[in-house]
Amino acid sequence: MFEIIQAVFSAGVALALLTFAGITLGGSVVACIISTPLFVIFSPVLVPATIATTLLASGFTASGSFGATAFTILSWLYKKRTGRDLPKIPGLTPPAPASNPAGSGV
């Protein structure tokens, strides 16, 4: 009985989601039909604005990344020079070999 209820509920949800998908697709087509003439009219402004915005965002991202990398390297160099190494991550390096191996019998 539980499987029947589950199947009916799943079919109802699937039907509702398909209905929403169809409504969304129809709305997207109507919006595309309405907005296409506006994009054609304003394209001499929109295309350069898009290019400028993309270049500006890429420049800020690259600048921030280079600055963060440089700061990390300078911080590492300073800690190396002053003898204050970063704490080691446990388990990252293998443990040192034992001075008395198990098979030596000593």
From Swiss-Prot:
Residue ranges of the TM segments: 14-34, 37-57, 58-78
Chief location bin: secreted
Highest taxon, organism lineage: Eukaryota
Family annotation (PROSITE patterns): OLEOSINS
Post-translational modification: Proteolytically cleaved following anther tapetal breakdown.
Topology within the bilayer: Multi-pass membrane protein
Positions of the UniProt region annotated as Disordered: 84-106
UniProt-listed Pfam families: Oleosin (PF01277)
Biological-process GO terms, alphabetical: anther wall tapetum morphogenesis
Signal peptide positions on this chain: none
UniProt note on tissues of expression: Present in pollen (at protein level). Inflorescence-specific expression, especially in flowers florets.
Cell compartment(s), UniProt: Secreted, Extracellular space, Extracellular matrix, Pollen coat; Lipid droplet; Membrane
Keyword entries, A-Z: Extracellular matrix, Lipid droplet, Membrane, Secreted, Transmembrane, Transmembrane helix
Gene Ontology CC entries for this record: extracellular region; membrane; monolayer-surrounded lipid storage body; pollen coat
Any GO MF annotation of the entry: lipid binding
Annotated family: Belongs to the oleosin family.
PANTHER family: GLYCINE-RICH PROTEIN-RELATED, OLEOSIN
Function in brief: Lipid-binding oleosin involved in anther tapetum development, especially for the physiology of tapetosomes. Also implicated in the formation of pollen coat.
Protein name: Tapetal oleosin GRP-19
Native source organism of the sequence: Arabidopsis thaliana
